[in-house]
Amino acid sequence: SVTADNASETKVREIGQEKSS
């Protein structure tokens, strides 16, 4: 991912993990 999108992408991954959990 682009550095500028790193923060938002990390949040998306964290949210996805919480939902899958």
From Swiss-Prot:
EC number: 2.7.7.27
Ranges of compositional bias, category Basic and acidic residues: 8-21
Role of this protein: This protein plays a role in synthesis of starch. It catalyzes the synthesis of the activated glycosyl donor, ADP-glucose from Glc-1-P and ATP.
Subcellular location: Plastid, Chloroplast; Plastid, Amyloplast
Gene Ontology cellular component annotations, sorted alphabetically: amyloplast; chloroplast
Major location category of this protein: plastid
Listed name of the protein: Glucose-1-phosphate adenylyltransferase large subunit
Annotated stretches, region: Disordered: 1-21
Enzyme class: transferase
GO biological process: starch biosynthetic process
Example of a GO MF term: glucose-1-phosphate adenylyltransferase activity
Native species: Spinacia oleracea (Spinach)
Reactions catalysed: alpha-D-glucose 1-phosphate + ATP + H(+) = ADP-alpha-D-glucose + diphosphate
Family that this chain belongs to: Belongs to the bacterial/plant glucose-1-phosphate adenylyltransferase family.
SUBUNIT field: Heterotetramer.
Record key words, sorted: Allosteric enzyme, Amyloplast, ATP-binding, Chloroplast, Nucleotide-binding, Nucleotidyltransferase, Plastid, Starch biosynthesis, Transferase
Taxonomic placement: Eukaryota, Viridiplantae, Streptophyta, Embryophyta, Tracheophyta
Pathway: Glycan biosynthesis; starch biosynthesis
Cysteine disulfide links: none
